[in-house]
Amino acid sequence: MIEKIVIANRGEIAVRIIRSCREMGIRSVALFSEADRMSKHVMLADEAYPIGPAPSKESYLDVDKIIETALKCGADAVHPGYGFLSENAGFARKCEVAGITFIGPRAETIERMGDKISALRSMTEAGVPVVPGIQRQLESATEAERICREIGLPVILKAASGGGGKGMRLIRSESEIGEAYAAAKSEALSSFGDETVYIEKYIEEPHHIEFQILGDAHGNIVHLYDRECSVQRRHQKIVEESPSPFLTDELRQEMGKTAAAAARAVGYVGAGTIEFLVDKNRNFYFLEMNTRLQVEHPVTEEVLGLDLVKEQIYIASGRPLHLRQTDIVQRGHSIECRICAEDADNGFMPSPGLVKQVTEPNGLGI
């Protein structure tokens, strides 16, 4: 069993991981940049070590420094949290080489599912429905025009290494193709260091529904049901809820089985999320897989009564899943909202400040 975990992150997710470590009797190690010396996660952890200056590239993204610190303090595992290095295959691989357990999937799985074109190919081979389009690099605007005529407008261009809505362009008329293609490639390169883009049919009025999954090193896979995240702005999630009010019981079961099959097809180990688009006729299509714990994971925890961080740690320790699919039942309803610190009277410009008062809802069952 893992005995000491370095948390390669900061803020809310670091505090969240420390809580589970404490309940499991596992020592937690916080890392902090110069700017985070007095942060809450530093105060709560059993041990804390500096890893560099305030800029993330020189601290929380410094792979060698993190591994060096983990070895120095005698940790046997690293939890990447979300963001930063959580989906960095190189980091996972270096942890393995150093003899440190990476609490997450294997490096090759991160690579395979992190590239959206590779992920689509894997899902097609596994018989998982995908959105019509091409499963390779789009070579030119001229090729985009030809594909648009084949599958019909509207279409969407996406960055193969993308996420967070970056490197995406919606095309509703052929006159937009040239400009959209150039813009998508440019944004993909600046955001992800990879200008590869692909094209697929744009699903009108979709519901964005994701399924949480867990897989162990013994080949066992379960799904932990659904979260709906259709309320978005700039392709970024604003509201998450579980269960989805859009799904029927039959469709929920079918999508859950498909999500588990998708994870099984790539030999997934750890906690992950299979994301789907569901059209207005309730046809569903694979969108992408997140090979990490997500910000919104507590939505699932609330309706299932599970601690996903603990499950991650048990899996990373080599234990088989203690959950059977028939044991997992949703109870109640859970909603998580993102608060955007923006000025609505000034073009929604960023407007950070101090939250002076919070009134939490209360009542029976809340």
Report the location of each language-model feature.
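N-terminal nucleotide-binding beta1-loop-alpha1 segment
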Residues: 159
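Short beta->alpha connector loops of Rossmann-like oxidoreductase domains
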Residues: 130
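Acidic/histidine-enriched active-site and ligand-binding environments that engage anionic O-linkages
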Residues: 146-156
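Conserved beta3 strand of the protein kinase N-lobe
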Residues: 133-134
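ATP-binding N-terminal substructure of ATP-dependent carboxylate-amine bond-forming enzymes
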Residues: 1-125, 138-146
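Alpha-helix initiation/capping motif
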Residues: 59, 84, 112, 137, ...
